[in-house]
Amino acid sequence: IINPDVTLKEDAIDNFFFSIKKVENFGIIAPVSKNEKYSNFNLDLDKDIKEVQNVKGFAMFLNMKNFKEIGFFDENFFFYFEEIDLCKRLKNNNIKIYIDPSIEVSHLGGTSHNEEINKPMELSRNWHWMWSSFYYHKKHFGYMSGLMKILPKLLSSIIKFIIYLIIFNKFKSDVYKYRVLGIINSVLLKKSWYRPKF
């Protein structure tokens, strides 16, 4: 799986096939990116393959036979947490996840959409981040646990929405309004329905 803003280095595929000879029962082997903001791994560390709890989803090599029992991505997620959820289900079934620093990609990050539609995408991003955050915690730890996790974010978003509304910062007030709406929809068990308006 590769995001549209990711390019594989020339030796990435060869290094991947070398990696699978070193590990057993893997579900995911992920590469690293030199883009520090979107990297899977601290590149200052050694080059050995390492077992981890989860990886970022910009590029992943999947061992498909290990997904027959647990399923693939949860389609209830539209943006965010889908790879964390996938990794959680793998780990719950004792299937290993690795990062291999010898497999390198170029990941621009944040460029998968046109700059002209930044505001609608930013509003959508915030809506879905909050929706997915509650849904993930509810799914794996229960409704009340998810509620306790998301409540501070809800209160913070409401306060910031009011502050930015008072000082006439429409963009910021809209961002926090959409955060609140994302949380409310998720807590009310509504689907991840919101789509950006252009």
Indicate residue ranges for each PLM-predicted region:
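Short, flexible, basic/aromatic active-site loop/helix in glycosyltransferases
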Residues: 31-61, 68
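A short, conserved alpha-helix in the catalytic core of glycosyltransferases
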Residues: 59-62, 66-71, 75-106
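Non-catalytic, C-terminal membrane-associated alpha-helical segments of glycosyltransferases
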Residues: 124-132, 143-198
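Conserved donor NDP-sugar-binding/catalytic core segment of glycosyltransferases
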Residues: 6-41
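Short glycine/proline- and charge-enriched loop/turn segments
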Residues: 43-50, 71, 111-120
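Alpha-helical elements of Rossmann-like donor-binding domains used by nucleotide-donor carbohydrate transfer enzymes
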Residues: 11, 15-18, 85-89, 131-135, ...
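Active-site donor/metal-binding and catalytic loop motifs
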Residues: 100-120, 133
